[in-house]
């Protein structure tokens, strides 16, 4: 059973910026399930997409892999000779726990977990690249360059899977979707204090884009096709095909 997320359950005098440290890594499975609507569906479908798009003797990347949920889903689904998965995260606490989880299961598809900044990783001969709720934590000025790098490293016909929290230009729609997300968190046992303090901690480090911004970026970089394939409230996932 996952350790319960109680990080923001008591009043904090000075709320610092949210970081993926040891405390977060310890409760991350509980936190993510109770915070992101549709997370399990996204993880399952990432495996389905990887099964469809992974090619023999190619690389599959999970950039910002955290505890390896997407990596494990893809490893269970990929059945291609010579295909390997490379997971990358810059949190030592996440990487340490991720390696333990990966090594707990045997598979014919090799997995390497790297502790590194995803902006510094070479993307080579890739058939599948996953950014699962990762891009939104990068400085907006760095996002286009990372996606260009991914595009350059993808094989023709390769797929990028990008899951993100979204903002919406229509103010009424945006507020409604935020409220529904908070209702989702309340239904999963988070208190008003927890919701408020988590929002204060994360608002300066997670800066979401609109769906239109994502699509425009994909188009400018050269992806031939992109679309939202899953959305629940203001969270969703897109694909972009080279």
UniProtKB/Swiss-Prot annotation:
The keyword Transferase applies. It holds the Pfam family Methyltransf_25. SUPFAM superfamilies: S-adenosyl-L-methionine-dependent methyltransferases. Transmembrane segments: none annotated. S-adenosyl-L-methionine binds at residues 39, 64-66, 89-90, 117-118, 132, 199. Its EC number is 2.1.3.-. It catalyses: prephenate + S-adenosyl-L-methionine = carboxy-S-adenosyl-L-methionine + 3-phenylpyruvate + H2O. InterPro entries: CmoA (IPR005271), Methyltransf_25 (IPR041698), SAM-dependent_MTases_sf (IPR029063). Keywords: S-adenosyl-L-methionine, Transferase. One of its GO terms (molecular function) is S-adenosyl-L-methionine binding. It comes from the Bacteria. The keyword S-adenosyl-L-methionine applies. It is an enzyme of class 2 (transferase). One of its GO terms (biological process) is tRNA wobble uridine modification. Catalyzes the conversion of S-adenosyl-L-methionine (SAM) to carboxy-S-adenosyl-L-methionine (Cx-SAM). Homodimer. Belongs to the class I-like SAM-binding methyltransferase superfamily. Cx-SAM synthase family. This is Carboxy-S-adenosyl-L-methionine synthase. It comes from Aliivibrio fischeri (strain ATCC 700601 / ES114) (Vibrio fischeri).
């Amino acid at each position: 059973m996952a350790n319960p997320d109680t990080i923001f359950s008591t009043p904090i005098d000075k709320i610092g910026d949210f970081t993926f440290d040891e405390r977060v890594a310890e409760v991350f499975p509980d936190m993510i399930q109770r915070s992101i609507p549709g997370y399990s569906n996204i993880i399952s479908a990432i495996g389905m997409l990887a099964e469809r798009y992974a090619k023999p003797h190619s690389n599959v990347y999970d950039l910002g892999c955290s505890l390896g949920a997407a990596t494990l889903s893809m490893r269970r689904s990929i059945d291609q000779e010579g295909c390997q998965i490379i997971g990358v995260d810059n949190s030592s606490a996440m990487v340490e726990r991720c390696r333990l989880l990966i090594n707990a299961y045997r598979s014919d598809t090799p997995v390497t977990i790297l502790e590194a900044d995803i902006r510094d990783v070479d993307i080579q001969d890739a058939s599948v690249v996953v950014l699962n709720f990762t891009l939104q934590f990068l400085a907006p000025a760095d996002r286009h360059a990372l996606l260009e790098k991914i595009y350059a490293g993808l094989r023709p016909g390769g797929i990028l899977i990008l899951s993100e929290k979204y903002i919406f230009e229509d103010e009424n729609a945006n507020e409604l979707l935020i409220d529904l997300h908070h209702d989702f968190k309340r239904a999963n046992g988070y208190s008003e204090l927890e919701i408020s303090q988590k929002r204060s901690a994360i608002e300066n480090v997670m800066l979401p884009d609109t769906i239109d911004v994502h699509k425009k970026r994909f188009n400018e970089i050269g992806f031939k096709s992109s679309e939202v394939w899953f959305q629940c409230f203001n969270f969703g996932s897109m694909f972009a095909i080279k």
